[in-house]
Regions:
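Bacterial N-terminal signal peptides that target proteins for export
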Residues: 1-8
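N-terminal compositionally biased, intrinsically disordered segments and leader/signal-like regions
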Residues: 5, 16, 31, 40, ...
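N-terminal cationic leader/targeting segments used for protein routing and processing
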Residues: 6, 27-29, 191
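Bacterial N-terminal signal peptides
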Residues: 10-19
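Sec-dependent signal peptide cleavage junction
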Residues: 18-34
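N-terminal capping segments
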Residues: 29-105
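...with weaker cross-activation on analogous glycine-rich loops/strands in unrelated enzymes
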Residues: 103-193
Length: 194
């Protein structure tokens, strides 16, 4: 009896293994392109990003430390409601990207793209807050621990919560392999700061 059950079990397994559905042609795997190579050398940004940095710098100079309030030109692209005090850093980043003409899409549209793929050389995740901006960049595989001028810097907490974003304006490598960054950020003490 035990031998018969063993034989039936083996036959059942073999039948399943060699059934037509098991032998059906499987779809071919698609080629995954290698991630963009990120250099460890500090390089000058491309013309489009240099233009973006000029806009960012001009905003810093124009604002000159003045309080921008809870509703300002950096938030108007999203809505006309007052934002929380010091809560418009991602709005500032997106406003600058819009001014520079950088192509972009909202996070839900970016997340609908194939992972690791962005439709343009330069592409921004339109967002009014860091918590939706950063996941879109992660989805496009556009993150790095090697800073470059024009990159978006994101700050977070140990609980993996993204709390603030800004622009890397300048990078100076230190002898110990770390970097000194100069950043321009919106919503720092309710103004634009470097």
């Amino acid at each position: 009896m035990i031998r018969t059950k063993h034989l039936i079990s083996i036959m059942l397994v073999l039948t399943l293994l060699f059934s037509s559905s098991a032998l059906a042609a499987k779809p071919k795997a698609t080629h995954t392109p290698p991630p963009a190579e990120i250099t460890k050398e500090i390089v000058e940004p491309p013309e489009e990003i240099q233009h973006l940095l000029e806009i960012v710098y001009n905003e810093w100079q124009t604002v000159n430390g003045k309080d921008q309030g809870k509703k300002n030109k950096y938030t108007a692209w999203y809505n006309d409601y007052p934002w929380g005090k010091n809560k418009w850093c991602a709005g500032f980043v997106t406003w600058c990207m819009l001014e520079a003409g950088i192509p972009q899409a909202y996070e839900k549209d970016v997340m609908a793209l194939e992972e690791g793929v962005a439709p343009e050389k330069f592409y921004h995740v339109t967002s009014s807050k860091p918590t939706t901006m950063v996941p879109g960049y992660l989805h496009m595989h556009r993150t790095s621990e090697i800073p470059q001028k024009g990159f978006i810097v994101q700050y977070g907490q140990k609980n993996n919560r993204y709390t603030h974003v800004g622009f890397v304006y300048d990078v100076v490598p230190n002898a110990d392999g770390t970097y000194r960054l100069s950043c321009i950020e919106g919503a720092v003490l309710n103004t634009v700061r470097m």
